[in-house]
Amino acid sequence: EITTRLVGSEMCIRDRTCAVLYGLIAIYVCCRYRLFLFKGISWFKIRPILMWGVPLIPHLATSWIKQGGDRYIINYYYTFAEVGIFSFALNLSNIIDMIGSAFNQTNSVSIYQVLSSNLDDKWERLQRQTKAIFIVYTIGVVAVLAVCSILIPLVLPRYAASLPYFYLLALSGYFQCIYFLYTNYLFYYDKTKDLMMITFFSSLLHLMLSMWLTQYSLYYTCLIYVFLKFIMVALVVYRANLLLNKYVKT
């Protein structure tokens, strides 16, 4: 116990020392390059930045609301073994989310280039690009499902019970990929407030449904992920199509 306290004390001192050093370096850099000066900055310049960025705060908090809330609710009603199986399935579905996010990094650049161009065939280009990325996402999801279905029972047989959960959560991950695709249009046209409203309130609904249904079965929790992700994607696609019809298709 004494050794543990000594180690903890040393780590605390080290962390505080690093924090002070980083703080001093930050102050030096700000003074050296005059980053504290706000000359020339006005409300008219700050306002569009705030209007674009502030709505993203609750938007980005939705992941914590959903997964953090689910973690506490599931831990309350189920054993550690059941929680571990479900968490493993959720982590597997996150692979699909990562695939969608990775491809979207490149795809978003192409979308912005088309939208900002003066081409006459913007709509046709975006349609072709959307079909192509849909095919990529579908192949990616099928590949992940196939690999996990084969390898998990062989390599990690104790986690084979997570596969039924994973199959449902994989569908939610596929919807997330579609969500990544269509949010690009909302970002481009500065509709982050609309995105915030959709994601934040869907997360609150997710939390309420989880508090109600999770106690009965973890399959209900998986279905909540699928259902609300579908609703969220449907709203984002609808809003994005309105923007495209207004600014691109006409």
Where does each model-flagged region fall?
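Residue-level recognition of pore/gate-forming positions within transmembrane alpha-helices
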Residues: 16-23, 91-94, 173, 199-204, ...
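Interfacial transmembrane-helix starts/ends
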Residues: 50, 119-135, 139, 143-147, ...
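Interfacial segments at transmembrane-helix termini and the short loops linking adjacent helices
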Residues: 146-174
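Single conserved hydrophobic/aromatic residue that forms the stacking wall/gate
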Residues: 1-8, 12-13
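Interfacial/gating helices of multi-pass transporter permease domains
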Residues: 45-52, 56, 74-94, 160-163, ...
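Helix-loop junctions and terminal segments of transmembrane helices
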Residues: 89, 93-119, 187-188
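Alpha-helical transmembrane segments of polytopic membrane transporters and translocases
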Residues: 17, 70-72, 84-100, 131
